[in-house]
Amino acid sequence: MLVLLMVLVFTLVLLFAFYLINFLLSIKDMGKNKISAFECGFVSVGKIQNSFSIHFFIMMLMFVIFDLEIVMFLGILVSDLSSYISFLMMFIFILGGFYMEWWYGKLVWVI
């Protein structure tokens, strides 16, 4: 247990040190080239800041969340019998979330 605690403390110290070094040594240039969008070497045409639809962002977010939940299911299914209660609770929670998204119309793929 002591070794695990030492590894955790060492990892956190190393993480903080790398973050601090990155913050101190990075170049903070906010020129025109830094804040503009890069489109394969061509000059951008039009307003770039609102170039994506929030609908696709929400769909991506739901995909990532459900994908992570499926990965958690795989870990629960290979464990012992006592974890099936946790599996059923998580499954009911995910089905409830899926039903709410369907009810509010968030699963429509049409723009």
UniProtKB/Swiss-Prot annotation:
Membrane topology value: Multi-pass membrane protein
Keywords of this entry: Electron transport, Membrane, Mitochondrion, NAD, Respiratory chain, Translocase, Transmembrane, Transmembrane helix, Transport, Ubiquinone
Cellular-component GO terms for this entry: mitochondrial membrane; respiratory chain complex I
EC number: 7.1.1.2
Subcellular location per the Swiss-Prot or TrEMBL entry: Mitochondrion membrane
Root EC class: translocase
Biological process annotations from GO: mitochondrial electron transport, NADH to ubiquinone
Any one Gene Ontology molecular-function term assigned to this protein's record: NADH dehydrogenase (ubiquinone) activity
Disulfide bonds, paired cysteine numbers: none
Membrane-crossing segments per the record: 1-21, 56-76, 85-105
Protein role: Core subunit of the mitochondrial membrane respiratory chain NADH dehydrogenase (Complex I) that is believed to belong to the minimal assembly required for catalysis. Complex I functions in the transfer of electrons from NADH to the respiratory chain. The immediate electron acceptor for the enzyme is believed to be ubiquinone.
Name of the molecule in the record: NADH-ubiquinone oxidoreductase chain 3
Species of the source: Caenorhabditis elegans
Gene (name only): nduo-3
